Amino acid sequence: MVVGIEGIITKKEPTFIIVKCASGLSYGIFISLFCSAKIQTQEKHEFFITQIIKEDSNKFYGFLDKDEQKMFEMLLKVNGVGANTAMAVCSSLDVNSFYKALSLGDESVLKKVPGIGPKSAKRIIVELSDTKTKLENVSDDKSEALAALLTLGFKQEKIISVLVSAQATGTSELIKEALKKLG
């Protein structure tokens, strides 16, 4: 199983790249539009890879950060959501917007994604509505900040709503930002 690829981007399309590794091998990798906007050809990058092997294909889906990869993999667990739909969500919503929509149960955000209708949006919200699942898929810093804020007596749903939109990095910075917003 391939979990990461590092190399120079030799070809770039909006949602597909070819990366040439030091070994001389080149790999085709599907990427989100957010990822595409951050990279250029002839640049060296490292990608977190989700490999999907089917009877007739072996595809790589690449991500610059672990949170986007976790979001993609989480979407794949929803009935009726395949890799193309999951990648469309990753291309349309950043990680924070996605988790905020989940925590608020906001189907309208998901319905704006090409290929997601009312039924699919509802299914995604329902199947991924478990708060614990959402928290396992955010960074360790956010999980630690959540635990700290819970001990201070704040309500879990409010904390999650604040943390998914937080811009700070690092546990202490996240806690400070959340405390300002939670009052």
UniProtKB/Swiss-Prot annotation:
Major site of localization recorded for this protein: cytoplasm
UniProt key word Acetylation: no
Region: Flexible linker, residue numbers: 139
Span list, region Domain I: 1-64
One function term, GO molecular function aspect: four-way junction DNA binding
Free-text note regarding domains: Has three domains with a flexible linker between the domains II and III and assumes an 'L' shape. Domain III is highly mobile and contacts RuvB.
Protein name: Holliday junction branch migration complex subunit RuvA
Chain's gene name: ruvA
